[in-house]
From Swiss-Prot:
Reactions the enzyme catalyzes: 2-(N(omega)-L-arginino)succinate = fumarate + L-arginine
PANTHER family from the UniProt entry: ARGININOSUCCINATE LYASE
Protein name listed in UniProt: Argininosuccinate lyase
Subcellular location: Cytoplasm
Biological process annotations from GO: arginine biosynthetic process via ornithine; L-arginine biosynthetic process
EC number per UniProt: 4.3.2.1
GO cellular component annotations of the record: cytosol
Keyword vocabulary terms for this entry: Amino-acid biosynthesis, Arginine biosynthesis, Cytoplasm, Lyase
Gene Ontology molecular function, alphabetical: argininosuccinate lyase activity
Amino acid sequence: MTASKSTETLPGDNTNTWSGRFDEPVSELVQRYTASVGFDKRLAEYDIQGSLAHARMLAAGGIIGPHDLDAIERGLSQIRQEIQGGGFVWQLALEDVHLNIEKRLTALIGDAGKRLHTARSRNDQVATDIRLYLRASIDRITALIHAMQKALLHLAEQHVDTVMPGFTHLQVAQPIVFGHHLIAYFEMLKRDVERLADCRKRVNKLPLGAAALAGTSYSVDRAMVAQELGFEGVCENSLDAVSDRDFAIEFCAAAALIMTHLSRLSEELILWMSPPFGFIDLADRFCTGSSIMPQKKNPDVPELVRGKTGRVNGHLVALLTLMKAQPLAYNKDNQEDKEPLFDTVDTLTDTLRIYADMMAGIRVKETAMREAAKRGYATATDLADYLTKKGLPFREAHEAVAQAVRFAEKNNRDLSALTLPELQQFSPLIEDDIFTVLTLEGSLNSRNHIGGTAPVQVAAAIRRAREWLSATPAAQ
């Protein structure tokens, strides 16, 4: 939606909808302090959708007349066009998106505009707007996660046989294939998609009809409004309907996990791109240079993903803190829910958009990966397993191999480079067939089970992942 014009017009007379209760107008400072239109105007489209559904329900129930409905529909259509075209004038004095639209509607159609708010409060109105906004955001984000997953699978398919070291404690542990490593992130994002889908179920309930907190004395048809707006049902307690922000907190928690997964991948990209690793190179469009060191190519995008993850985590804590001491029902504190939520959506959306493209621009240095897998005695566990299969208790095999590693390290050689007599001094069970076991390919192929790093299993995992993507819609 195109950004609309913004003004900070502060009329001299008090034009608030609730001014009849007060002897003096709100001060200019308080108006600025309490206004939310600067950020909640992004809810305008959802506010219009909710108002149209509400008006149609009022007309169907005979609460407003058909001529009122026709005028409201025409007026809201014009307002939508003004907002999309950037010609709508937002007034700070009108406080929020709801009153700005209502005042403009009344100016366009007269008394019919004043009847729109019948059987409705801004409390249930804003709760509805946020849920509509978040539902649409979840669908867009889910589609972006799928794009990221496809990028991971595309890269993994190219590297089913590319050997690299697997790490624990950032120390070389065992050989794996690069495709296997990438699928680990696919699985993380798969859980993220499932969490978002589960969160969406709780987002997709209609608060409208709860009014301020106790419901309304009008005979409203909440089911009709829910059906028109695509909600699966209605919030069943009016107090909870207007005060609940669990769904926003739950989304932010899911978003924080997604960002955490991307941050972990970012850390690895940064490490892999550094000269001590030299496993990959990122496309130039995702990097910057140094103002003083001409040789530098800095992985700015992955670094910013790490940094922005802290930002999203902070928004989650902000929302939890916002809600922790509020009595029922609605309180003005809840105005502070929108900026953390909006920024979480924006940050996550931008991160996912850029990440899929960044994965497509990765150049893998296969030789460097393979050479690194040869270092650090990555096949030591295979030697221990070999001895165990020969009948030696695993703990004894572990000790024998540890001594063999010390010997090899002292002589600056890999286990596979030791002679048979040298190996047999640590266990007489070792025979000629050990040298097949100690190769990188031998180690990889021995992990031939679901979830293992054997190339044949990695290829099967990629097929299963593509089947899951095909069966999982991006939008519910």
